[in-house]
């Protein structure tokens, strides 16, 4: 906001599915979502790569795969959350039934439940690193193809204006992903 004080930026947090719906219906101008996506009505650019971690109580047995946490409660966001879909796919990939999904509305709440030994959760390494209490859990990186997620900035085709372009430029100054053509994903 310091560089562009006249720009009115409103931020909203929601699962990727809900943000994409907001884009498609025109309620949102842009959204940060798990990608890449190939929707004919949207364009986007990758902003960052996130390492995904399964978090468990502090001293569990080793977690080598979903069979090691079968039947455990899973703390997650609503069904429209892309990380939840990834975790469900991780279980399905090895034909392991996922435990009961318990919907929690914050990462802090998920972490507290895991610290208490009530189940497991999936979150990005950067999110976990930002939370107090992160040292009270054990972390277990997922194997490919579930090990990482790329956060994309998405917008409706033809709606990339000067304000959004300037924001993209600011975000990409510290970017760690290889250069990608800004307008081509669909």
Report each predicted region and the residues it spans.
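Short secondary-structure boundary segments
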Residues: 35-36, 58, 125-127, 151, ...
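Central regulatory/effector-binding core of bacterial HTH transcription factors
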Residues: 1-40, 104
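A late-sequence structural motif
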Residues: 138-181
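Secondary-structure junction motif
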Residues: 73-94, 161-169, 178-183
């Amino acid at each position: 906001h310091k560089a562009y004080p006249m720009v009115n930026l409103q931020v909203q947090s929601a699962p990727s599915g809900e943000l994409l719906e907001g884009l498609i219906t025109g309620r949102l101008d842009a959204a940060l979502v798990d990608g890449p996506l190939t929707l004919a009505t949207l364009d986007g650019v990758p902003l960052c790569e996130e390492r995904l971690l399964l978090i468990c109580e502090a001293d569990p047995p080793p977690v080598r795969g979903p069979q090691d946490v079968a039947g455990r409660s899973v703390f997650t966001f609503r069904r429209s959350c892309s990380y939840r879909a990834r975790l469900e796919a991780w279980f399905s990939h090895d034909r392991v039934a996922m435990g009961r999904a318990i919907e929690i509305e914050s990462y802090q709440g998920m972490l507290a439940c895991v610290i208490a030994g009530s189940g497991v959760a999936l979150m990005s390494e950067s999110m976990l690193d930002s939370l107090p209490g992160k040292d009270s859990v054990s972390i277990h990186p997922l194997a490919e193809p579930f090990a990482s997620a790329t956060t994309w900035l998405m917008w409706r085709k033809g709606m990339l204006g000067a304000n959004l372009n300037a924001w993209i430029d600011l975000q990409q100054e510290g970017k760690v992903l290889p250069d990608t053509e800004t307008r081509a994903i669909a």
